Amino acid sequence: PTAAQLADLDVVLFDVQAVGVRCYTFLSTLVLVMEACAEQSLPLIVLDRPNPNGHLVGGPMLDTASVRSFVGFLPIPLSHGMTLGELAEMANGEGWLGGGYSTSPNPAIQCDLTVIPCTGWSRNAQWSAPIAPSPNLPTPAAVQLYPHLVLLEATTASVGRGTATPFTKVGFPGFVRGPISFTPTPNAASRYPKHAGKPCQGFSVLRRLGSWQAQGTDNRLKLEVLNELHEAWMNTPAGDQNPFIDRPQFFDQLSGGSELRLALEAEEGLEALQNKWGMQRARFMEMRSVYLRYPTSP
């Protein structure tokens, strides 16, 4: 918000449902609102809401020195497991405000922040938002799969935008091993879906989600779908001439840096990167602990 938009206000209320993923831009909007309120000496009240992916923490950290953008403002993992209220207090407490779209936050800037907590929620509880957080996350399954599939947005693969069930299936034209087929079509939720009007072959990810939950491994970010589609694309005739990651800058912004993209393009294993993310995750878990407001149920 601009200074003119805030000029006649006494207080700003922020009440938005997020899904626990760094690149979900409601978080970036919150940071910008905090900075604007700080600049205008306006108090901000965040009406906190549960995180439907509160159990999930992992993935690459954001390198704010190189890829800070509207799909990534804060130096946190791709999936952070926190509520917006907790993250607002963390941004204040860690001096992450004041950078806007630059790569140099100003620790001196503080927002006059009040967080009204939600009640009756524990971090690893199964919880679904009463309304869809956004048009392309229309179901609880789509919300749960979003962290694992969002990086595909910067690739040639479709995540089902332009269909009735986005973020539950993946594919692209010419995926010969794909057991399902779908054709993205412009609709109210996606006016310009990838591969619009072209039949895409691929597979449903719903069964994967059920398997991860049954195995108790759904608390870590999964890159297996990204890997499988990358390998499948490279084995198509189009893959000889066209990169799988067709929007490299956007991919880096989503993933938090260039390391993952470079490893995929070089067809290297991801074990070293995942080990690095594991160490970063441990440090983040310790850092965030002082800002957590909600229990973790046994």
Predicted feature descriptions by range:
Residues 1-8:
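Glycine-rich oxoanion-binding loops at beta->alpha junctions
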Residues 11-19, 45-48:
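Short acidic catalytic loops
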Residues 39-43:
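A short helix->loop->beta-strand "cap" motif at the edges of active sites that frequently abuts
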Residues 18-30:
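Glycine/threonine-rich flexible loop motifs
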Residues 45-68:
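Glycine-rich, charge-decorated loop segments at or immediately adjacent to ligand/cofactor-binding or catalytic sites
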Residues 108-111, 119-200:
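Glycine-rich, aromatic-lined ligand/substrate-binding cores of catalytic
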Residues 166, 171-276, 296:
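Conserved functional hotspot residues or short segments at active or partner-binding sites
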Residues 67-148:
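Conserved anion/nucleotide-ligand pocket segment
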